[in-house]
C-alpha cells in the first residue's frame, strides 16, 4: 500500500535494470562518471526480457518495452551463455517469447530445481565460449532430469486428483501430496493439474532433505485468488505459514496438517463457483479458414505483440473442419491436419493424448477448433501450424 511508484508490475530483473539505469544517471549528474564513460546497460536488455517473461510478469507499461527490445537484443546473440543454451536446445534464432519462456527459461531454472542454481548464473555471466558450452550442456542434462522427476510426480498427483474428484465432483480445488516429492518441481506439477482440470491446484511435498516440514506450491485460475486463501489459512493456524498472489502461492505445513488443510480449502473455495465457471469461458478473436493461415498472417499478428501475461495472444477458431492424419508424437502430444474444401492446416495439441481433447481429435470427425497460430522453420521451409487449445464435435 505504500508503493506509489506505479512500477509494482516489474519483475526482479526489471527492478535491477531500472536501478542500474538510475545509478548511471546519478553518477552522471554528480560528475562521478569514470573518464572512459559509464557502462552501457542496453546490451543487458536480453536478460531483462528473459527475467520478465520467466517471472510471468504482466506485459504492460515498461515491461512491454523491456520484452520487445530485449528480444531484439537476444536475437543478436551477444551473450555467449544464451547462445550456447539455445544451441543445446536446438534453437536457431532466440527471438520470440516462446523461445525465452519455454526453451531457455526451463533450462536456466533446472539448476535451481534439481541441481546447483549457480550454474545458470555462471552461464549468463561468462564471456568464454567453451565454458558457456559446458555449462549449457550441464543445464540441459539437469532439465532432462527435472522433466523425468516432474513426470513421475505428475502421474501420482493426477491419480490423487482423480480420486478426490470421484469422491466429490463439486470440489473447487485440487490438493495432492506425497513424501519424497521434489520441492523443485511441485510448482510445475501444480500448474499441470490446473491446466488439465481447470481448477486451482496445490501440490505438497516433504522429505528430500527438507526435514519434517512440508512445502507446497499452488497455481490458480482467473478470478480465484489462491494467495489470499493460503494467507487466510496461515492466519487461522491451519498451516504454519504461506502467502502469494492471485495466480500462485506457497506454503509450509506439517505433513499431518494436510488432511485438515485440504478440508479447509475445499470449504473456502466453495464460494468461488461462479468465478471458476467464468474462467472456463473462451474468448475467440477471429474465425479463420485453414487455407487462410499463412506466414504473412503470423507476421502481422506478431506486430501487435509481444504476448504474455496481461497481453493475451489472439485466439483463432476453425469452424467445422475435418480431422485427418491423427498421430501421437513425443510423450503425449497429438498432431493432425485440419481441412475443409478450401485448404488444410497442420495442427498440434500439446499434452492432449490422454485428455478429453485428445479423445475428440482421435475420433476423426468434423470438429470446431480454437488455438493460436505459430510459424517455424523446418528443413529451410517456413510452415504455419495451429497450437490447439480446445475442440468441440460439430
Named regions from a protein language model:
Residues 1-15, 25, 37-40:
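Hydrophobic, small-residue-rich alpha-helical packing segments that form membrane-like cores
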Residues 3-6, 57-59, 184, 357-358:
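A generic structural signal for short coil/turn motifs at secondary-structure boundaries
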Residues 5-7, 92-93, 191-192, 324-325, ...:
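A generic local secondary-structure boundary/capping motif
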Residues 25-257, 328:
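Hydrophobic helix-and-loop "lid/oligomerization" segment in the mid-to-C-terminal part
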Residues 131-135, 142-176, 210-212, 224, ...:
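Mid-to-C-terminal polyanion-binding domains and interfaces
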